[in-house]
Regions:
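Acidic, gly/ser/pro-rich intrinsically disordered tails
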Residues: 1-5, 20-25, 41-48, 89-92, ...
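OB-fold ssDNA-binding interfaces and closely related basic DNA-contact patches used
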Residues: 1-36
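Exposed loop/turn and edge beta-strand positions of beta-sandwich/beta-sheet ligand-binding modules
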Residues: 8, 28, 51, 94, ...
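OB-fold and OB-like beta-barrel modules that bind single-stranded nucleic acids
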Residues: 9-16, 34, 71-82, 100-103
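Short, acidic/hydrophobic/Gly-rich beta-strand patch recurrent on exposed beta strands
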Residues: 31-35, 54-56, 96-98
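A beta-strand/beta-hairpin structural motif
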Residues: 42-67
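Beta-rich strand-turn-strand
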Residues: 58-93, 106
Length: 126
């Protein structure tokens, strides 16, 4: 069988503070929305197009997101895509999310200092 790769790398801005919950087993999970932008030519000008990505972080990365990630922060994440679905009113709704395995805080609005900048890089990897 040949090997396959499912790897996503995103650099973008956090849309809102992380939504952090604890499972019944006591495991932390965080959901973060990140925006990425690109410029595309449209009628002689460049139009900016924004894409929103749903990120899911577990355990230590969820804790790091809860402690250090805020709306407006610029972050780098690596992970893999996962697809699923759920039912709502008898309709199947498809979902897509990035399961994050590495998180790096790149910058904060207004230059606020984040303690995450003092951590060694391996502390930000699951």
């Amino acid at each position: 069988m040949s090997r396959s790769i499912n790897k996503v790398i995103l650099v973008g801005n956090v849309g809102r503070d992380p939504d952090v919950q604890t499972t019944s087993a006591g495991t932390k999970v965080a959901h973060v929305s990140v925006a990425t932008s690109r410029r595309i030519p449209r009628e002689g000008a460049l139009e900016e197009r924004t894409e929103w990505h749903r990120l899911t972080l577990w355990d230590r990365l969820a804790q790091l997101a809860e402690d250090y990630v805020r709306k407006g922060d610029r972050i780098y994440v690596e992970g893999r895509m996962e697809y699923g679905s759920f039912e709502r009113n008898g309709v199947t709704i498809p979902t897509a999310e990035v399961l994050v395995r590495e998180l790096v805080l790149l910058g904060t609005p207004g230059g606020r200092t984040a303690a995450a900048e003092d951590m060694e890089e391996e502390e930000l990897v699951a």
